[in-house]
Amino acid sequence: MSIAPAVSEWFAGNGRDLPWRRPGFTAWGTLVSEFMLQQTPVVRVVPRLEEWLERWPTPADLAASSPGDAVRAWASLGYPRRALNLHAAAVAITERHGGVVPEDVPSLLALPGIGDYTARAVAVFAYGHRHPVVDVNIRRVIARAVLGPGEPGPAAKRDLADMEAILPEDVTDARRANAAIMELGAVVCTARSPRCDVCPIADQCAWRSAGYPAFEGKRAAVQKKFAGSDRQVRGLILAELRASDIPVTAGEIALVWAIDEQRERALAGLLADGLVVEAAGAYELPG
């Protein structure tokens, strides 16, 4: 028996009210939200998403601004390379697609910075096409409820096939099931504290039926701590540049982090990524 019907019924009464789930939300808004949600919690994304769409309501609006404006507006969302990719995608949409976000997966995949998950998510949630969409939350639900292990392990090619086997044939039902299973993994079947007492498919869950066995497979890679990392140093340098209307000198950048080797490595990485450019011996966001 598929878990989709029960999860979809639960979702109808328990899904969170999020901007990208509301009627009339644009395909561009969906694309922006997916970029932001890639590695940032929902609670931090919602206010920034609303700011972005008010400032840049269409791809053409963002394309007309500089990449530096996009990086500056990205601010504390983290992984600012996404801002450059989103700006590049906006330029491509404007130039290749007349300012309209494409709706088929191959065309979406051809845009800068868009991988398989984002392409499928936009095709499904913005345009209503039938595709399996697999993120970490969906992988966790399938691993536990259908396959039995307590964790999904590293991403694998079989993930899409596992989700495809669950999806209803009806296009509307499939779209709802994608969103519902994703939501279940986000708020109920969580990684550390699953709330099995309120789970709508607890009676169908293979992991629960087996007595919650410990996971013995290969685990997904765990992200290193942020404090003291190169990521933190990169963020501090970018924050310094965002706060300045003029290029920032190497001496000023030296004040943000005391360890010379790590600071220089972080700055070199930002330059290589195109997030920072050199200007007459100083540094600034890309123009």
Which stretches of residues belong to each language-model region?
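A short, conserved structural fragment
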Residues: 271-283
